[in-house]
């Protein structure tokens, strides 16, 4: 049995920590991969490269091992996480948890603690851990603190258990939490928490148990020198005191930080020792010295170590005192800065001195002894001194200068590196301690690299110049001395001396210059010139020397030899029959490589530098190309010239010597020899001339082509030195191309007969031989023999001439003549050895046969037969292959295609009422040509046979003029196809041509229309038969039979006469479609395919029935005429073995005529619309050919659309109702389909007429206006038409024919008419309400679907019509001195039509959609107030109620309720009248806005799966009127109050569902209207300005509609926003007197209260308070007499800003309360008056104080007790007035004191002090005024009941002090005034800035 205890949450946390650790390691491995696996070599030598490769391999092995370890780590974490989950699952399933729950329940309920169990760990920052169980249980852990917050204390244990650990302190120095107390009897105290980063103190350990259990350990101090926590005390008997926490390291810095002190050990118990003190922290490291300059900076001093903690007090009886803590170690000194690179003339700077190590920390005192038998504790040991800092590295020497390019000069010497810095002194320890060791000396700087030698100059006309030598590398810097050890203690080691630097690398030698190219040959066929040699590369520079023990620099690399010049190109051969191209020139020799530089010498014990590598020899020049042979336009081409020899390669440079004086170092490697030049390419042979072409129309043979010239031989490759690579031989030249054979002449056309044959093509010329390849160079390795040149391409054979075209028929109806035969193609030319033969010429194409003539018009003569096509020409043979492996015989030529047969002539068109003529037959296609033969290669295929000619189209039948139309003519037969040509030896025979397509039968003529009003139309003519398809040759494809002609369309019936509404005429029947032609017979062979039968013609469409006549006024419309019957489809064409054609489709029945429209009512109800005509029956489908499918029957005609009902008349007089609209006409029945056809759909019912509008109201009997008339009811929609032959109710679809027919769908019921709009109420005194809107018409019933004859599914019945929309209610009249009238109620929506009944197997139609209720009318606007002292505005009218939605039929969708009307706007209050001497009139109060109308109720659902309608939306409340402005008076008057916003309308109730399921959603309530703005206060006239008026209250939101059974209640609207308070009036200026003070500004008006929301709605926001008025300016002081001038007046105080309005309260439920309004801005204080000039002068007046900011409005209260809305912010304080200027005088008066700012949101700036007066006497001096104090910030608005208090505003800035007065002549200037103090922030606001002092005055002269 296991005794291991597992805490699953700890295991899960450990798995998470391991996951993070694995991610960190993986990221570190990835970042280090590139640096560790691709190690760069320290030098260019082989040893450095091998070492780098070795360490790179180690890096790769590490990465591979890391990948395996990461995979194991991932599997381990996965197993750990899985185990934690398993333990957690086992705990959850264990019975222990259930038993503990039963045991702990009573004590948990009574005392708040369990009986058994651990306390919970805290989760919130700084939270305390939970207490353990009363009997058994450990305390929970405290949570870590937030930044700057102390960690939470650990929870206490019960009787038996350990205390919980304290939480860690937050970053920024937070103290760790104290550990929890151990159990009352047994248990260890919890450990204290770790202190937060930034020097936080660790938490104290918890006390132990009474009987047994030590105190907890103190927490470790926070990073940055935190002090450790005290250990917990032991309790009575056996527990030892806890150990103190350790201090932490001090942070780094210029001087390292002091380490943290160790914590005090805990006191022991009666029988137990005290705890040990904590160890002190290590001092921080000193900062590094700065880099750069001639001398690097000195490193910083290390920090002092922390003192160890004191041991705990010993036990009362037997325990010893605790041991003191170990002192902290001193910090390490900083590293010295690196010396700058090359700062003193190029020499590197000396490294800086290392920093001094830190002083060691003191040991902690031992713990005191106990009372009886215990001893004191030992003191802690002293810490170790810090190590001195390392000296800085010396700077690198500058590199030597590179020599200029193309000069060959030696590079400059590199500069010496700087010396390393001295190591720092070790830190001191006190007696008994250990001193710190000295720092290591710095590394010497690296010597500079030598400069690169200059490259040799290129030579455009000779040998290239040699490159210059590289410069010598610079010497390395000396290493720095080690630092001294510390003093005061024992130990400490002198620092190690620094290493010497590395000597500089020698410079690279310059590259040799390139030699110039040889001259090209100028004379025809001459040899090109030899190229020049390249220059030698320069020697590498010597490496630099190093100091003792250092590493020398490596020698420089020798320069690369210059490249040899290219040989000149040979001349081109002359243009003559024997001209040969010239030989190319020899390439120049490459330059020798430069010698490697000597390695640098080493000091004693050092490593010598390696010698430099020798330079690479230059590449030899390429040989010149041979000249091309001459072309010969009239004979054989010339041979190409031989290519030039490649140049020899340059020798490699010698390796450099090693350095002296030390060990190691390698001799430089010898340079590589250059690569020999490539031999030149042989010239191309000239092309042979082409054979002459025969003349066109001559039928002659074309001339043979001439042979091409031989290609030139390739040049030899250049020689290489020992070890070098030889040049490759040049490639041989390509042989010339043979000439093309001439084309054969074409056959002549024959205008009177058959065409002539074309001539044969000429033979192609032979190809030229390819040139031999060049030899390789000698002396080295490698090099390739040049490739033999390619033989030329044989000439192509000439193309055979085309046969001539045959003549067309010479007269009307005569046949055309045959085409001529195509000529044979010429043979291809033979290739040379290994070449490619020419292809045989293509055979000529046979001529096309002539077209037959067109038959004459009139009675319709037949067309002529087309001529046969000519045979295709035979193809030429391919050329013979040349000798060799790569030879390829030529392909045989392509055989000519046979000519196409001529097209048959078209039959003549029939005259009116006569048939058309037959089309002529097509001509036969020509035979294909024979394919060309080839000796060994691929033979050509035979030519394709010509296609047979297309048969002529039959003539079109004549159109009927007084009767039936004529039939169309029969189409001509297609021509037979030509045979395919025979293949060449091994080639495939050509494919036979395709048979010609039969001609298309002519279309039948259209029947005549009816001859008069209401008469029937005539039948259409029959379509002509299609021609038979032509037969194919052996294996060919037959032509398809011709398509039968389409039957003619029947004539349209005439339209019925207007007036009383006559019926329309019947449409004529459509003509039958023509029969299709038979397909052609298949040819002999496996691939033969018989032709398809032709497509049968479609039957003609029946004529459309005539439209019924329109009814006269108040009469019904006429019935529409029936549609004509469709024609029968044609018979499909037959085929012997292939696919037979399908029969033609029957014609569509004609569409029934539209019923006539009912007449409009003039004095009453409108007339009904006429019934629509029946649709025509469909034509039958044609029979199929042998094996073919019968044609589809046509579609039955659609029934006519019923006529629209007439519109009802409007009301006959003022205030009377309108009349009803007429009923819509019934739709016509759909036509029946033929067997298998598709029936026509029933016609749609007509739309009901719209009801008439009510008449407008009038003034009747005095001041009241008349009510508006009610709108007329809309007419019902017409029912759908009947199907064919079915009497009675319902617009049924047609029945299906026998077979797989599809019955027609029932018609759709008509839409009900829209109700008329109610009349508008008249403007009156008082105003009148608007009339009610008319109800919408009911929708028509859907038609019944057609019946299927097979007993299968019948057609779907028609949908019911939609109900008409209710009319809109009339708008209320505007008030004229009174309240506005209310809007009329919207009309009720029409009920939906019932869906059509289902037939056997069919689907019933859907019910229509109920009509939407009409919109309620808008209320009228209230009138403005009367012109009086307080003329209040009138209220707006109430919005009309929305109409009720129409009901749906069974299963339909109900109409939505109408939207309530908008309430009218309240009238504006009048401005107050101007006051008399005493007081002005007050502004009038704005009128209240009208209440929004109630939304209409939604329609109820029909029985079944109906969807009830949504309730209407309540109307929006009207806006309140604005208050009038107060008059300017004495005193001035306050502004009027704004009117209240109207209340939002209530939402409509949702429709009820008849099935008991969910009903529709109810409508949303309307939004409340916005409150009106308060009026502005009047300006003061010798008094204080008037206060602004209060803003109007926002309207309450409308209540959401009540829910029906199962439905959803509507949402409440949004409460209206409160109006803005008016602005206060401005105070008057002061009176003209000695101290005329200005008057105060008026107070801003209070913002209006926000409207309340309904249940669950959103409240309106409170209005914004008005701005306080500006204070008046003080008057200037009066001019003084001889004694004293008058003082300037004080500016008036600014008015106080208005209080923000309170936000609306939330409705019951999930409502959102409104925000409080924003307080108004305080008014600006007035400016103080200027002091008068006098003797002495008078002080300037004091500036007025700024007005206080308004208080923020209170946030709305939430009814649910949850968070309420935020309160408004306080207003900003007004700016203080400016102080007056002091008067000029004798002894200067003090400047006026700046005004004090008012309290407010953002305090205003204090006024500036006035300037001091000028001195009065030579000894006097003025005193400046003192700047005003900044205003205090206003208090923030109070928050709602659950949100707390808002922040106060910011304090204002203090005013600036006044400038001192200027002294009189001989006097002294005044002193500068002091700046004002900044205002204090209130409730969280920031204080303002103090003002600036003034400038002193200037002394007098």
UniProtKB/Swiss-Prot annotation:
Designated gene of the protein: PE_PGRS54
**Does the keyword Repeat belong to this entry?**
yes
Keyword Repeat appears in the UniProt entry: yes
- What name has this protein been given in UniProt? Uncharacterized PE-PGRS family protein PE_PGRS54
Region named Disordered: 146-175, 249-289, 577-626, 915-934, 1116-1135, 1254-1288, 1311-1355, 1415-1440, 1461-1495, 1519-1560, 1620-1645, 1666-1700, 1724-1761, 1809-1901
- Which Pfam family, any one, appears in the UniProt record? PGRS
Specify the species: Mycobacterium tuberculosis (strain ATCC 25618 / H37Rv)
Q: Where is the composition biased (Gly residues)?
A: 915-932, 1116-1133, 1262-1288, 1311-1322, 1330-1348, 1535-1553, 1740-1758
Supply the SUPFAM superfamilies for this chain: PE/PPE dimer-like (SSF140459)
Record-stated family: Belongs to the mycobacterial PE family. PGRS subfamily.
Question: What keywords would UniProt list here?
Answer: Repeat
The residues forming the signal peptide are: none
Top-rank taxon of the source lineage equals: Bacteria
> Boundaries of each PE domain copy?
1-93
């Amino acid at each position: 049995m296991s005794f291991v205890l597992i805490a699953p949450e700890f295991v899960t946390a450990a798995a998470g920590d391991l996951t993070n650790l694995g991610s960190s390691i993986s990221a570190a491995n990835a970042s280090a991969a590139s640096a560790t696996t691709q190690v760069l070599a320290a030098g260019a030598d082989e040893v450095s490269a091998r070492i780098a490769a070795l360490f790179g391999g180690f890096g790769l092995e590490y990465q591979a091992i890391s990948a395996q370890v990461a995979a194991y780590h991932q599997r381990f974490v996965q197993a750990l996480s899985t185990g934690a989950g398993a333990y957690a699952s086992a705990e959850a399933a264990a019975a222990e948890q259930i038993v503990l729950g039963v045991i702990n329940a009573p004590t948990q309920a009574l005392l708040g603690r369990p009986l058994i169990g651990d306390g919970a760990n805290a989760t919130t920052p700084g939270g305390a851990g939970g207490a353990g169980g009363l009997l058994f249980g450990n305390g929970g852990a405290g949570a870590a603190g937030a930044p700057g917050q102390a960690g939470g204390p650990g929870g206490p244990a019960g009787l038996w258990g350990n205390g919980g650990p304290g939480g860690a302190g937050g970053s920024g120095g937070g103290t760790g939490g104290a550990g929890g107390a151990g159990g009352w009897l047994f248990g260890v105290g919890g450990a204290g928490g770790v202190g937060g980063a930034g020097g936080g103190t660790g938490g104290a350990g918890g006390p132990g148990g009474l009987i047994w259990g030590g105190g907890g350990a103190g927490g470790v101090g926070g990073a940055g020198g935190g002090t450790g926590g005290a250990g917990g005390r032991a309790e009575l008997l056996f527990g030892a005191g806890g150990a103190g926490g350790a201090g932490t390291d001090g942070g780094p810095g210029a001087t390292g930080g002091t380490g943290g002190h160790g914590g005090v050990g805990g006191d022991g118990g009666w029988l137990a020792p005290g705890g040990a003190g904590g160890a002190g922290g290590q001092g921080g490291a000193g900062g590094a010295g700065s880099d750069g300059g001639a001398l690097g900076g000195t490193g910083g001093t290390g920090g002092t170590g922390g003192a160890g903690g004191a041991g705990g007090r010993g036990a009362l009886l037997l325990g010893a005192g605790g041991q003191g803590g170990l002192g902290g170690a001193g910090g390490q000194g900083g590293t010295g800065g690196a010396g700058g690179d090359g700062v003193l003339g190029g020499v590197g700077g000396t490294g800086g001195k290392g920093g001094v190590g830190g002083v060691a920390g003191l040991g902690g005192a031992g713990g005191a002894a106990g009372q009886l038998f215990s001893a004191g504790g030992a003191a802690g040991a002293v810490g170790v001194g810090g190590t001195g800092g390392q000296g800085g590295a010396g700077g690198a020497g500058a590199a030597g200068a590179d020599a200029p390019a193309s000069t060959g000069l030696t590079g400059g010497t590199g500069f010496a590196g700087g010396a390393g810095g001295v190591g720092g002194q070790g830190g001191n320890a006190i007696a008994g301690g250990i001193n710190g060791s000295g720092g290591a000396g710095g590394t010497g700087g690296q010597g500079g690299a030598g400069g690169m030698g200059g490259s040799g100059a290129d030579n455009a006309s000779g040998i290239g110049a040699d490159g210059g030598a590289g410069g010598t590398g610079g010497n390395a810097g000396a290493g720095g001395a080690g630092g001294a050890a510390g003093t005061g203690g024992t130990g400490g080691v002198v620092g190690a001396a620094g290493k010497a630097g590395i000597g500089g690398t020698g410079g690279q030698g310059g590259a040799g210059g390139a030699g110039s190219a040889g001259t090209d040959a100028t004379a025809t066929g001459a040899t090109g010139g030899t190229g020049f040699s390249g220059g030698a590369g320069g020697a590498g520079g010597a490496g630099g020397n190093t100091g003792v023990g250092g590493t020398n620099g490596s020698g420089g690399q020798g320069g690369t030899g210059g490249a040899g010049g290219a040989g000149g190109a040979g001349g081109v051969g002359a243009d003559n029959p024997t001209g040969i191209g010239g030989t190319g020139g020899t390439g120049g020799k490459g330059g020798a490589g430069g010698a490697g530089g000597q390695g640098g010498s080493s000091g004693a014990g050092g490593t010598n530098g390696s010698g430099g590598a020798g330079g690479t020899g230059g590449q030899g020049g390429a040989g010149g190309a041979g000249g091309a042979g001459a072309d010969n336009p009239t004979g054989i081409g010339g041979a190409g010239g031989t290519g030039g020899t490649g140049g020899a390669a340059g020798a490699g440079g010698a390796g450099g010597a090693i350095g002296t004086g030390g060990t190691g170092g390698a001799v430089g490697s010898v340079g590589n020899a250059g690569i020999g030049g490539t031999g030149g390419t042989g010239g191309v042979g000239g092309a042979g001339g082409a054979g002459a072409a025969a003349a066109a129309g001559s039928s002659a043979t074309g001339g043979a082509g001439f042979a091409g010239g031989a290609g030139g031989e390739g040049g030899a490759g250049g020689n290489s030195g020992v070890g070098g690579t030889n040049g490759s031989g040049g490639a041989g030249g390509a042989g010339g191309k043979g000439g093309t054979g001439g084309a054969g002449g074409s056959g002549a056309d024959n205008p009177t007969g058959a065409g002539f044959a074309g001539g044969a093509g000429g033979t192609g010329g032979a190809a030229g031989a390819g040139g031999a390849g060049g030899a390789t160079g000698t002396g080295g390795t490698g090099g390739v023999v040049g490739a033999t040149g390619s033989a030329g391409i044989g000439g192509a054979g000439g193309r055979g001439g085309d046969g001539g075209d045959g003549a067309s028929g010479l007269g009307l109806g005569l046949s055309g003549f045959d085409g001529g035969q195509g000529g044979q193609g010429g043979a291809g030319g033979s290739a040379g050895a290994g070449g490619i033969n020419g292809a045989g010429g293509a055979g000529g194409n046979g001529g096309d046969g002539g077209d037959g003539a067109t038959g004459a018009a009139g009675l319709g003569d037949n067309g002529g037969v087309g001529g046969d096509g000519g045979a295709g020409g035979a193809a030429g043979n391919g050329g013979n292959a040349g000798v060799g492996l790569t030879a390829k015989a030529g392909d045989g030529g392509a055989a000519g295609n046979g000519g196409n047969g001529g097209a048959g002539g078209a039959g003549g068109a029939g005259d009116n009422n006569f048939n058309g003529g037959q089309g002529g037959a097509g001509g036969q296609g020509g035979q294909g040509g024979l394919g060309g033969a080839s000796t060994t290669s691929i033979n050509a295929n035979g030519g394709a046979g010509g296609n047979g000619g297309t048969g002529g189209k039959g003539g079109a039948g004549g159109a009927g003029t007084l009767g039936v139309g004529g039939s169309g003519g029969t189409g001509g037969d297609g021509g037979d196809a030509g045979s395919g040509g025979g293949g060449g030896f091994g080639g495939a025979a050509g494919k036979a041509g395709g048979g010609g397509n039969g001609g298309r039968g002519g279309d039948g003529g259209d029947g005549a229309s009816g001859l008069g009003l209401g008469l029937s139309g005539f039948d259409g003519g029959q379509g002509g038969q299609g021609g038979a398809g032509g037969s194919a040759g052996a294996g060919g494809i037959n032509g398809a039979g011709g398509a039968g002609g389409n039957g003619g369309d029947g004539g349209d019936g005439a339209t019925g006469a207007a007036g009383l509404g006559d019926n329309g005429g019947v449409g004529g029947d459509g003509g039958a479609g023509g029969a299709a032609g038979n397909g052609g017979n298949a040819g002999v062979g496996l691939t033969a395919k018989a032709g398809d039968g032709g497509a049968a013609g479609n039957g003609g469409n029946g004529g459309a029935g005539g439209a019924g006549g329109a009814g006269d006024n108040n009469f019904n419309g006429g019935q529409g005429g029936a549609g004509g019957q469709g024609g029968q489809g044609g018979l499909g064409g037959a085929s012997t073995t292939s696919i037979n054609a399908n029969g033609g489709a029957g014609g569509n029945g004609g569409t029934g005529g539209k019923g006539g429209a009912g007449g409009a009512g003039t004095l009453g109800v409108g007339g009904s619309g006429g019934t629509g005509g029946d649709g025509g029956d469909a034509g039958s489908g044609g029979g199929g050919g042998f094996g073919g499918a019968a044609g589809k029957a046509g579609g039955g005609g659609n029934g006519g659309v019923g006529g629209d009902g007439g519109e009802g008349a409007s009301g006959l007089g003022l205030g009377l109702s309108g009349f009803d609209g007429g009923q819509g006409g019934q739709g016509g029945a759909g036509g029946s389909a033929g067997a298998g056809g598709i029936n026509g759909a029933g016609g749609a019912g007509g739309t009901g007429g719209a009801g008439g509008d009510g008449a407008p109201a009038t003034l009747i009997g005095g001041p009241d206006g008349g009510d508006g008339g009610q709108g007329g009811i809309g007419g019902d929609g017409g029912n759908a038409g009947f199907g064919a032959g079915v009497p009675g109710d319902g617009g049924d679809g047609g029945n299906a024919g026998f077979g797989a027919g599809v019955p027609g769908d029932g018609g759709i019921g008509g839409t009900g008419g829209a109700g008329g709009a109610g009349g508008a109420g008249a403007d009156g005194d008082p105003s009148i309400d608007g009339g009610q809107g008319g109800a919408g018409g009911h929708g028509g019933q859907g038609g019944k679907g057609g019946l299927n004859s097979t007993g299968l599914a019948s057609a779907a019945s028609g949908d019911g019509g939609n109900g008409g929309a209710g009319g809109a209610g009339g708008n209320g009249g505007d008030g004229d001195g009174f309240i506005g009238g209310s809007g009329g109620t919207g009309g009720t929506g029409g009920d939906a039509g019932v869906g059509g009944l289902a037939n056997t197997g069919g689907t019933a139609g859907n019910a229509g959609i109920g009509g939407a209720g009409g919109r309620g009318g808008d209320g009228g606007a209230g009138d403005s107030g009367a012109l009086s002292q307080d003329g209040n505005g009138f209220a707006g009218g109430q919005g009309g109620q929305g109409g009720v939605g129409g009901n749906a039929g069974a299963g339909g969708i109900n109409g939505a309720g109408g939207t309530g009307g908008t309430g009218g706007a309240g009238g504006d209050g009048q401005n107050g009248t101007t006051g008399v001497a005493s007081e002005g009139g007050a502004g009038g109060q704005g009128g209240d806005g009208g209440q929004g109308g109630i939304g209409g109720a939604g329609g109820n659902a029909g029985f079944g799966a109906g969807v009830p309608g949504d309730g209407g939306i309540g109307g929006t409340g009207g806006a309140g009127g604005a208050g009038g402005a107060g008059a300017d008076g004495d005193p001035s008057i306050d502004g009027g109050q704004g009117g209240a916003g109207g209340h939002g309308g209530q939402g409509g109730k949702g429709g009820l569902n008849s099935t008991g399921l969910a009903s529709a959603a109810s409508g949303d309530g309307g939004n409340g209207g916005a409150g009106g703005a308060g009026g502005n206060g009047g300006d003061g006239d010798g008094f204080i300005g008037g206060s602004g008026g209060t803003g109007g209250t926002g309207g309450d939101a409308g209540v959401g509609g009540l829910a029906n059974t199962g439905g959803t209640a509507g949402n409440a609207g949004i409460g209206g926003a409160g109006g803005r308070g008016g602005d206060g009036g401005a105070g008057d200026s002061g009176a003209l007197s000695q101290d005329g003070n200005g008057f105060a500004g008026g107070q801003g008006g209070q913002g209006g209260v926000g409207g309340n929301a309904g249940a669950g709605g959103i409240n309106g926001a409170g209005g914004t308070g008005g701005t306080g008025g500006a204070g008046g300016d003080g008057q200037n002081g009066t001019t003084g007499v001889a004694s004293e001038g008058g003082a300037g007046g004080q500016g008036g105080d600014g008015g106080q800003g208005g209080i923000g309005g309170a936000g609306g309260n939330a409705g019951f439920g999930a409502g959102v309360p409104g925000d409080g309004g924003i307080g108004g801005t305080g008014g600006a204080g007035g400016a103080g008056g200027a002091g008068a000039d006098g003797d002495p002068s008078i002080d300037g007046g004091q500036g007025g104080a700024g007005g206080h900011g308004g208080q923020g409005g209170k946030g709305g209260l939430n009814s649910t007790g949850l968070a309420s809305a935020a309160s408004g912010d306080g207003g900003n304080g007004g700016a203080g007035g400016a102080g007056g200027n002091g008067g000029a005088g004798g002894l200067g008066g003090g400047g006026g004191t700046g005004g004090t700012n008012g309290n407010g949101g953002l305090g205003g700036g204090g006024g500036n002090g006035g300037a001091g007066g000028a001195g009065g006497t030579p000894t006097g001096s003025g005193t400046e005024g003192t700047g005003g104090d900044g205003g205090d910030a206003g208090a923030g608005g109070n928050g709602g009941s659950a949100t707390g208090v808002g922040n106060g505003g910011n304090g204002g800035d203090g005013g600036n002090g006044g400038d001192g007065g200027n002294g009189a002549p001989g006097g002294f200037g005044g002193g500068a005034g002091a700046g004002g103090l900044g205002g204090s922030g209130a409730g969280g606001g920031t204080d303002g800035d103090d003002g600036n002092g003034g400038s002193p005055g200037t002394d007098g002269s």
